[in-house]
Amino acid sequence: MNRILFHSLTIPPDQVSTGKLVAEIASKFKEKNINIEILASMPQYRFDSSEFTNEGFKKISGNVFVSTYKGVKITHLSSSKRSFSRVKRFSQWISYHLKSIIYLTKNRKNFDTIYIFSYPPTMNLIAIYSKKILKKKTIYSIWELYPEIAQKLNELNSNLLLGLFKKVDNFCLKVIDSVVVNSEQLKEYLIRERNIDDKKISVIYHFANEIETPKSEKLTKEIMYAGNVGTPQNLESFINIFSSSKKEYKLTIYGSGSQFDKISDYQSENLIVNSFIHRDELIKQTKDIPFALVSLSPKITIEGFPGKTFDYLKMNKILIGYSNPDSSLANFIEQHNVGINISPNEKNLDSKLDIFEDAKVVQQIYQNITYVNNKFANIDIISQQYIELA
């Protein structure tokens, strides 16, 4: 029997969408009687060591805990609360990788195939180790492409380091068995710019395996945003054009991140900024908000696709994208007609919002949201695509 290991940084009870996706996919492997376990960190975002025991964590050594998720065993490696400092965050990644390598080496006889999920971007080091040293079948799922994102956002200004990272990443993608990406555009980029064999690249979309919540009863002029508040999200730019709107929309933000304090300074009658809250509470507080903002730096095109897109759709929110018109996000919104995309170069926000004054257009968008939820947020379809790679 093929013994599978999923390796991720985040996993429930961390309230991080990517970690929840990994856990849900693993649970579907388990339902099909596939031998599967997960290796992840201890919670970094919702961190309270006093609560670990209450949430089903069992300490088996100084740095190792175990828990279960829908019958899937999870081994957690100890970690500290996520830092928003770049230097500290990088050191956290490396520390986690070292612990992972020790664990994988000690337990290499317990698994045959390893699925590695790409955040952080340095997970490529583990993928290389898995394939070249441990000789395991290795599938690497890329949700954001580095160093391209770091370069475009000026997060790494050393050409030497950028070149070195790209060489390491390319080596990883060429030696492993399969690569998973979340858009056709990213697949085409890897083939064209990175010379990766198209036969080893599979496109599997993000999804949100949550219960679909009812749409808001009224089409009020309210927009929500929930998630990371950092440089890639480009929220400050959206707020600047939002503040010039005469449509009297209200924007409510729920989040945390490196730009949170700065964004909080913009609070006004029409802009409310709240700290991160859990999804159940988020649904309660936003049930009457019909629109959701998905904001992305205009420098990012195919390199990243916000996972919250599908979470918003499961909440039956009409999407307001704020991204480069050539981005995978803009392409998705417009191709499936689940909202609008606004270019960061747009000078007149109100002219874009006019479309929502047509009741027939809004009705069609809601129908399209239902279609997309059934097609792209179907956990059975998504998990089967991953199973076929094993």
Residue ranges and their predicted role:
Residues 42, 185, 204-207:
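Carbohydrate-associated surface elements
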Residues 344-351, 357-390:
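A charged, aromatic-enriched C-terminal amphipathic alpha-helix characteristic of glycosyltransferases
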Residues 216-233, 239-243, 251-252:
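Conserved donor-binding/catalytic core segment of Leloir-type glycosyltransferases
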Residues 260-283:
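Nucleotide-activated donor-binding/catalytic signature segment of Leloir-type glycosyltransferases, i.e.
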Residues 105, 122-125, 129-133, 159-179:
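Membrane-proximal helix-turn-helix segments that form the acceptor-binding/catalytic region
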Residues 1-62, 240-246:
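N-terminal subdomain of nucleotide-sugar transferases
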Residues 166, 170-200, 330, 386:
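A short, active-site helix/loop in glycosyltransferases that binds the activated sugar's phosphate group
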Residues 233, 278-287, 292-313, 319-331:
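Nucleotide-sugar-dependent
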